[in-house]
């Protein structure tokens, strides 16, 4: 059964009396976030290891182990390919809004896939909020450590459900 994610934003009152939308990132903040993420590329894996208190590898393995075998998989926010490089078999699509991340991820992931005899992954520049894929086109959709960076979480979740086949798996890892 499919359920549409409500589009009603969650707003919290600030000390100054204004409101903060906890589910959306403003334009200036989004641009700054992209610049900061791009700057982390050389140390991205190390930053994730520290931010997850050393649990990043375990969490990635846990997600990989729960994916359907030889599925059609979309990873939203692939970053430099840290998760995707170890995904075996199937059709793999890696989406990221930052071209520099894709430039790092593509050779890293496809080198690993080629060495295993897996088909090359497809890399797409884009965001969770506007997925450039047909409805019901993936067996699984995952987002590891990028959900916090989606500029409109409700819209991104709706889009994820739209491209997911009925009965498919949606997995989001977002450390608190």
Regions found by a protein language model. Give the residues of each.
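A short glycine-rich, Lys/Arg-flanked "PGG" loop and its adjoining helix->strand segment in the class I
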Residues: 154-166
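A short SAM/SAH-binding and catalytic strip from SAM-dependent methyltransferases
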Residues: 140-152
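Class I SAM-dependent methyltransferase Rossmann-like catalytic core
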Residues: 41-53
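Conserved beta-strand signature within the Rossmann-like core of class I S-adenosyl-L-methionine
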Residues: 168-175
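Class I SAM-dependent methyltransferase SAM/SAH-binding core
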Residues: 74-130
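Conserved alpha-helix/loop element of class I SAM-dependent methyltransferases that forms part
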Residues: 52-70
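N-terminal auxiliary segments of SAM/dcSAM-dependent transferases
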Residues: 2-32
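A short acidic, Gly/Pro-enriched loop at the edge of an enzyme's catalytic core
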Residues: 129-141
């Amino acid at each position: 059964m499919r359920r549409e994610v409500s589009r009603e934003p969650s707003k919290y009152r600030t000390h100054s009396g204004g409101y903060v939308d906890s589910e959306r990132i403003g334009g200036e903040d989004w641009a700054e976030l992209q610049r900061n993420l791009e700057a982390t590329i050389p140390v991205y894996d190390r930053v994730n290891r520290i931010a997850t208190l050393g649990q990043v590898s375990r969490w990635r393995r846990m997600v990989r182990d729960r994916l359907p075998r030889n599925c059609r998989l979309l990873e939203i926010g692939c970053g430099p390919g840290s998760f995707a490089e170890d995904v075996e078999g199937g059709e793999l699509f890696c989406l990221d809004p930052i071209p520099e991340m894709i430039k790092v991820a593509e050779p890293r992931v496809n080198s690993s896939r080629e060495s295993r005899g897996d088909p090359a992954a497809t890399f797409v520049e884009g965001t969770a909020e506007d997925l450039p894929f047909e409805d019901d086109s993936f067996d699984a959709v995952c987002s590891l450590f990028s959900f916090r960076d989606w500029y409109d979480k409700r819209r991104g979740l709706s889009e994820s459900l739209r491209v997911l086949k009925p009965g498919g798996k949606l997995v989001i890892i977002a450390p608190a």
